[in-house]
């Protein structure tokens, strides 16, 4: 894996800097590095593909070295270099694709394709060893079963979940009280609602709670907490739990009271925030508990009182909500996030070449399925294919 990254880094630098008119002295170190790559690769043969519709390709290396000059690089010099660069880039691209479409239930962190296994040989270590990528650094740590750490922005840590629970329900669905939520990606939105606006609740207060368990522990997280759930702020028709009918949700938004958010690890509270909104932080956690209250207003103008009558029919529904958004965090496991395209890169290649479903990943690389059942085998394989995708993205956009 290190060699593949070093190849890609060398080729990217060469493609960007070996251009017509450049002083040789400005790129002499790069050209020496490029020549070392050629010397190491010459005389070797590789085969890639042969799975799904990914075609089998054979690769052989027999390239001349780039010479020295006292002047600027001319068109002939650059054309010779470009021909070599283009072949190597095509080779690296195909090695990456070959690796991204393979998986294994055992030791999925290790190279799975024959081409990458061959590149892992000791003789290829002479290719300007470069370990500066976060993915490569963590791949090496995971390969040695040491602790890893990935920094994510808006990590896709929450499997998609959208539903509701009713704490009070009638067959006519005309006087309901409960909680509805939408968990997806890095965001939780939860709303508590009461058709009667807590008129019969103790002290005219309804208590709501929403607990979300993460599939992986997050550390040093920066989080935004807002006293609103905009996705539940407009009317909608909702299917009943048994699917036999539908009911009408017509919210009027109130501000939540006594808001508390707890971050827990293995059942122990690590951080607690009460009535604090905006930016908050959490040290390390695997569970989030949100609790908040709907309080019936003590004093109401006639127009507000008309929204919340003392008896049925209830035409509007008192609603309070929260939004919790993980802006950034560190995780020992690899995740998809908002700043990278690794999941899309891997998925698109597997779809384009009709790669058959293997023993590890779900069909279509369904992220909700993958993160919901994030087994050690999936973790190893995902870290490997994401590392390869990060290498490929250096050369192929």
Curated annotation (Swiss-Prot):
Q: What is its main location?
A: virion
Does the keyword Cell membrane belong to this entry?
no
Its ancestry begins with: Viruses, Riboviria, Orthornavirae, Duplornaviricota, Resentoviricetes
Is the keyword Flavoprotein in the record? no
- Positions binding Ca(2+) in this chain are 266, 286
Output the HAMAP family linked to this UniProt entry.
Rota_VP6, Rota_VP6_A
The record lists the organism as Rotavirus A (strain RVA/Human/Philippines/L26/1987/G12P1B[4]) (RV-A)
Biological processes, Gene Ontology terms: fusion of virus membrane with host plasma membrane
Q: What does this protein do?
A: Intermediate capsid protein that self assembles to form an icosahedral capsid with a T=13 symmetry, which consists of 230 trimers of VP6, with channels at each of its five-fold vertices. This capsid constitutes the middle concentric layer of the viral mature particle. The innermost VP2 capsid and the intermediate VP6 capsid remain intact following cell entry to protect the dsRNA from degradation and to prevent unfavorable antiviral responses in the host cell during all the replication cycle of the virus.
Question: What protein name applies here?
Answer: Intermediate capsid protein VP6
Which Cys-Cys disulphide bridges does the record give? none
Cellular-component GO terms for this entry: viral envelope; viral intermediate capsid
Binding-site positions, Zn(2+)? 153
Q: How does it assemble?
A: Homotrimer. Interacts with the inner capsid protein VP2. Interacts with the outer capsid glycoprotein VP7. Interacts with the outer capsid protein VP5*.
Give the record's keywords alphabetically. Answer: Calcium, Capsid protein, Intermediate capsid protein, Metal-binding, Ubl conjugation, Virion, Zinc
